[in-house]
Amino acid sequence: MKHFFSSALLLLAGLSISQTALADDSVTLPERHASAQFSSYDFDHVKESGSYGAALYITSIGQWDKFHVGGNCSFGVNAGLVDDWGCQFEFGPSVRYDLGSRFFVNLPVNALCFATFPEGSTNTHTEWGLTVSPTLNAWITPKFGVFAGPKMSTNFKNDATFGFVAGVSFAF
């Protein structure tokens, strides 16, 4: 639980610093963007629970003032980080809140399918779960942005774990 609170404090500190550092209002927030990202499901086991991958976000299917609803999907792999490699697929709805012309907070709530492929075995181990990962998104240019935030996940059998997600985004 201490990792969750430290992540939330870092997110808020980054928000206050970046709001003043990027005050140009000429950038409009994209409705669609793709990202390259690294995420970890557990702060205590970053290498073992981490994955690098790509995501597609459609963050503005519906809009009410500064609130948007949308969806997203992501695919990541943990190949080369540990002996037993795995992959994960996340998909689900998201809520976005605009903080200004360059910043928004995105809150995806995703179903998670995690598959591992043990070395030397033909068996595949699959688990389903749920992830919630609020991210602060900052757009440097109209087509390029960065994001980071905490990530909470559970596979419905064990306690929830807390990790992080970070990456770069490209609007299209």
Could you say what each language-model-derived stretch is?
Residues 37-41, 117-119, 149-151:
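Extracytoplasmic loops and strand-loop junctions of Gram-negative outer membrane beta-barrel proteins
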Residues 144, 151-158:
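Short, exposed beta-strand-loop hairpins at the edges of beta-sheets
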Residues 54-146, 170-172:
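Gram-negative (and chloroplast) outer-membrane scaffold detector with strong preference
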Residues 147-150, 164, 168:
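Compact, aliphatic and Gly/Pro-tolerant "microcore" segments centered on a short helix or tight beta-hairpin
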Residues 1-30:
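Cleavable N-terminal export/targeting peptides
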Residues 28, 48-50, 85-87, 124-126, ...:
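A generic structural micro-feature
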Residues 19-82, 165, 169-171:
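Short glycine/proline- and aromatic-enriched beta-strand/turn motifs that initiate or cap beta-hairpins
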Residues 17-18, 116, 156-157:
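A short hydrophobic/aromatic micro-motif that marks alpha-helical segments and, especially, helix-coil
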